[in-house]
Structure formats: C-alpha cells, structure tokens
Swiss-Prot record:
Belongs to the class-II pyridoxal-phosphate-dependent aminotransferase family. Histidinol-phosphate aminotransferase subfamily. Its EC number is 2.6.1.9. The keyword Signal does not apply. GO terms for biological process: L-histidine biosynthetic process. NCBIfam families: hisC. This is Histidinol-phosphate aminotransferase. Its cofactor is pyridoxal 5'-phosphate. It comes from Thermoanaerobacter sp. (strain X514). Pathway: Amino-acid biosynthesis; L-histidine biosynthesis; L-histidine from 5-phospho-alpha-D-ribose 1-diphosphate: step 7/9.
Amino acid sequence: MIENLVREEIKGFKNYEVHSIPYRYKMDANETPFELPEEVIKNIQEIVKSSQVNVYPDPTAEKLKEELARYCGVVPTNIFVGNGSDEIIHLIMLAFINKGDVVAYPHPSFAMYSVYSKIAGAVEIPVRLREDYNYDVDSFIKVIEKYQPKLVFLCNPNNPTGSVIEREDIIKIIQKSNGIVVVDEAYFEFYGNTIVDAINEFENLIVLRTLSKAFGLAGLRVGYAVANENILKYLNLVKSPYNINSLSQIIALKVLRTDVLKERINYILEERKRLIKELGKIPGVKVYPSKTNFILVKFKDADYVYQGLLERGILVRDFSKVEGLEGALRITVSSCEANDYLINGLKELLL
C-alpha cells in the first residue's frame, strides 16, 4: 500500500551511499586531518554553557552571518546560512524549481545536484566535461541556448575531478543564462579564486561555500550562500525556522575568528604537491591536476587497488563505476602520516 503513496520521483531512488567500513585512515570524504583549533578546545566548556541549548537557536544566525560577511567581503544581508551546503542546494530547488523545469550541471560532478533535481521532478541535463576533465564551456553555452535551464550548477573547483572553470567563462555562462547560476565553491580555500565579488553585478548568481572542508567543521554541518538579497529572501521563505543549531553557530563563529586557516591550507597544499609527485612515479597510475584537497587517480584495475587499500585500512572513494570516471579513485589529501601510509600501500600493490 505504502508504495502506491510514494511520489513518482522517489520510486526507484537509491540512497546516497556513505561508507561505514572500519579504517585506519579515512581518505574518502575530503575531510581535514585537523581537529578544532586549540584555543577553541580550551574554551569548549564555556562555549557549551553559552550556547543555551535549552532554548531554540537564533533562527537568523545573525552573528555568524556577520562573521561570514567579513570573511567574504560582503554585507550580512548577502549571506544565507544552511545546515551544510547540501541543505542550501535543496532549498534552491524548493524555492525555484517546478516539476519539469530544466536543471543543467557538469558531469561528472557532485552527486547531490542530480539527487535534488530528481526529488524536485526537474529535467536534468548533465553537461559532459572534456576528456581531460576540464569544463567544456561551449557545450554549456549550447545547452543554455537550446534548453533554457532554470538552474545551472558550476562546481568550481569541481568535485571529484579537481578541475576548475575560469572566471571569464563563468561570466559568459551567467550572461547567457536567463535562469539562476549556482557556483559551488566548496573547495575555494584550496584554490583561491572566487566569483563572490560579482553577486551584485549579476542578480541571478548564487555562490555556495562550506565550513566542512578547509575549516574542518564537517560534523557541525555549516554551509552558506552568498548572493544578492532578492534571491536570498526566497531561500528564507522555504527554510525551516531553526536550521542551524546553537553549538554549530557558536563553534563556527569561534573557528572563523582564529588565525589557523592559512597555516593549515599551506600544509594541505604542500602535501597535495608531494602526493601528486609520489603517485606519479608509480607505473600505470594516472594522476590528474587538482585545485582542491583531493586528487583523482586512475588505475588499470581500480577495484584491485580499492580492495587492496581497504585491506590495509585505507578508505578512499571509488568512482570507477561512474560513467566518465572508469578506473578512477578519489583520494583525500590528509596528514603526512596518512599520505605516507597510502603511498607505501600503493607501492606494495603496484610495484
């Protein structure tokens, strides 16, 4: 009986898979190897006390918005805070997408663009990346001209390929589009280039960011959107009243006010460089350039490598069954210790 009541868009749906496999080193979800900054840990009792968990959190996350606005160089009214950037993607769909509307996004890219498009009943137009995983801007523009998508996603840098789309190409796509263009900058801190400064020039632009990656707050679920007020007012209409809990708001605020980010970013960038160099020395391994905290690597037998790493307690993300990513594993750049263990494990398997 229940099956007959389920929405057509949900029938045949598969859960987004999150691995719960025992591991020694978790290098599959692009998380930071760093814990909370020491000064935050020292004050954790005070933070918990001040969070007043017996009352509902600030529904507007005003203090956090102010700090994020300072970080981004905008005003607080240009900031919307969500329970992870995933929630914001969902809210964008709720606010703007009717059943049958067209949504375009790069392929391969972040899986949730497709997931939330399906839930919304949208018509999906995946735009293939080039063979080297760079953006095919001409194809995007052709799709926009032909299908007039109501929503276009650009992941920059792109997950899981690590490739980027240049600013002038983003602007070309925005100018061609009559719909909303969402530029997902989840990995911005590892890249350094942004389109945030263009939000007031283009009223159809939304920039997504997260504190899950560079800031190391994946467990708190704090994402944010940067856009003009005319767009954000509609996201506020469809969000739940208390979507960010008190502890997440306060800890995120404290972490944003620390000065550890630059040092931690530099550490990851150096480890990324070293990891790419070392893996590139192994015969039969193709390593793709990356502007993120992960690297995409192709193997002749990805399943053999994946299982071999798993047996050694290393969990990486297997994309080898995804169309366009045959033979590919995505590896998070982690601590020096974890990266060394990975390098040695791959050498044992392939040399």
